[in-house]
From Swiss-Prot:
Predominant location category: membrane
GO molecular function: protein-transporting ATPase activity
Pfam family, one: SecD_SecF_C
Membrane topology: Multi-pass membrane protein
Gene Ontology BP term (one): protein targeting
Gene coding for it: secD
Name of the featured protein: Protein translocase subunit SecD
Subcellular location: Cell inner membrane
PANTHER family the UniProt entry points to: PROTEIN TRANSLOCASE SUBUNIT SECD, PROTEIN-EXPORT MEMBRANE PROTEIN SEC
Described function: Part of the Sec protein translocase complex. Interacts with the SecYEG preprotein conducting channel. SecDF uses the proton motive force (PMF) to complete protein translocation after the ATP-dependent function of SecA.
Domain of life: Bacteria
Source organism (scientific name): Elusimicrobium minutum (strain Pei191)
Quaternary structure and partners: Forms a complex with SecF. Part of the essential Sec protein translocation apparatus which comprises SecA, SecYEG and auxiliary proteins SecDF. Other proteins may also be involved.
Keyword Membrane: yes
Length: 473
């Protein structure tokens, strides 16, 4: 056996062992019951490199969010683009900390964001977590004056003093001094605050939930960064004796009196439930959204529908593959069996590659896999037909195989290359499901060329070392 043949088989065996290594955790994971997988996911013990199931296969919720770009300080196209990109990263950080792994989050158009939550048990909590702007501000409460007393009386006498965004209506806002704003209190009523904000949630380093706050309610403690500690120390040190309002999303959570200069730590107390406190801590750690977001579309897919999709997709795929394997073996005999071996390896290598990239398998992804397998079969058919032609011309066994691959290569390359170009455009301009199709198709085409050309040729080279008289085609 030549060194060239040995190298080819070494490459194939390394790829095969690597695929088995990558697919074994996937097999173990999906051998577990749904309850066991849910427990492992909740405890954070979910394996990292496994083949994830998408929303259409696993069930869950799909949300379409709209970023309110009109609330951006700078509403230029560049600023809007940056705001959407930052919002995607912040939402991803929030969901990751909430415990939902590998959530597909993609941009849709100029100001929309698609979020898929496969397998999540309580989508309402995740929706509240995603939609919360989490704009944390620290403002000094204005001391009581006759002008503010008059403004307060006017606000209380007005039936609808607030607009739909929770801001004071313009006719009442103009009654306030230039350096003053008024915001609602969480427990009812409103507070007059300084308009200037000197410390925000961007200055925080960490936030966590503590039990044992006021009246036994959970509270959120926070720690400032080094720069934030300087700002907060300056703010509290120069306003001892005044009230400091802790404002979250334009609502005053509490307004404790400043007893001394505070630098590093603080806490937000209120009548939080444990879930509310946990979500607040997560949003503060992940950062504030650059602008408010609202959920404009929500779709829910039940787990049973996802299981039906899996069964239907797997069944259809297996039926199609088995029929192709049988037809190839009948029509091309030994050549068909060699092609079938390459096709099976193609599927194994493709699934292993997807597991290595921690990809998410969806129904469009399954369609991409099937199409790539069809392209691989087409490549094998081209090779076998060219080999048949050379055999009819009386070529020797080696010449038949060599010329068959040489003459078929240009057609194989052209068909796969044009498909790669299409897949590239689909990935660049398509939405989430279309991108999933494009990714699996691209991987499948690359692996298909490897198995159809490299693997099958290695098998023929191995057969030639035994000096056979003929290979049935």
């Amino acid at each position: 056996m030549s060194n060239k043949v040995l190298v080819k088989w070494a490459v194939i065996l390394v790829a095969l062992f690597a695929s088995v290594y990558l697919l074994y955790p996937v097999y173990k994971w999906y051998s577990l019951s749904n309850e066991d997988r849910a427990k492992l996911e909740a405890s954070g013990d979910r394996p990292k490199n496994i083949l994830n199931l998408g929303l259409d296969l696993r069930g869950g919720s799909s949300l379409l969010l709209e970023l309110d770009v009109t609330k951006l300080p700078d509403n230029t196209p560049a600023a809007r683009n940056d705001a959407v990109s930052r919002a995607i990263e912040i939402i991803r950080n929030r969901i990751d900390q909430y415990g939902v792994a590998e959530t597909p989050i993609t941009r849709q158009g100029e100001k929309w964001i698609s979020v898929q939550l496969p397998g999540i048990a309580n989508p309402a909590q995740a929706e509240a977590l995603i939609g919360k702007t989490a704009m944390l501000e620290f403002r000094i409460v204005k001391p009581q004056t006759s002008a503010l007393d008059k403004a307060a009386a006017k606000i209380e006498d007005t039936e609808e003093p607030w607009d739909e965004d929770g801001n004071l209506i313009p006719s009442l806002a103009k009654l306030l001094p230039a350096d003053t704003i008024v915001l609602k209190n969480k427990e009812g009523g409103f507070s007059f605050l300084e308009k200037e904000v000197k410390v925000t949630g961007a200055d925080l380093e960490n936030a966590q939930v503590n039990v044992g706050g006021d009246y036994g309610y959970p509270e959120v403690s926070f720690t400032f960064s080094a720069e934030g500690a300087k700002k907060f120390g300056s703010l509290t040190g120069s306003n001892i004796g005044k009230q400091l309002a802790i404002v979250l999303d334009n609502t005053v959570q509490s307004a404790p009196s400043i007893q001394s200069r505070i630098t590093r730590d603080g806490r937000i107390s209120g009548r939080f439930t444990m879930d509310e406190a946990r979500r607040l801590a997560i949003t503060l750690r992940a950062g504030a959204l650059p602008a408010p977001v609202k959920i404009i579309e929500k779709r829910t897919i039940g787990p049973s529908l996802g299981e039906d999709s899996i069964k239907s997709g797997v069944r259809a795929s297996l039926y199609g593959i088995v029929i192709i394997l049988i037809l190839m073996a009948i029509y091309y005999k030994s050549g068909g069996i060699i092609s079938n071996i390459a096709l099976i390896l193609n599927l194994v290598f493709l699934l292993a590659a997807m597991a290595a990239f921690n990809a998410t398998l969806t129904m469009p992804g399954i369609a991409g896999i099937i199409l790539s397998l069809a392209m691989a079969i087409d490549a094998n058919v081209l090779i076998l037909e060219r080999m048949r032609e050379e055999k009819l011309r009386g070529r020797s066994l080696y010449e038949m195989i060599d010329l068959g691959y040489t003459k078929a290569w240009s057609a194989i390359f052209d068909s796969n290359f044009t498909s790669w170009i299409v897949a590239l455009f689909l990935f660049q301009f398509g939405s989430g499901p279309v991108k999933g199709f494009a990714v699996t198709l691209t991987l499948g085409l690359l692996i298909g060329v490897f198995t159809s050309v490299f693997v099958t040729r290695a098998i023929y080279d191995l057969l030639l070392t035994a000096n056979p008289k003929d290979i049935s085609l």
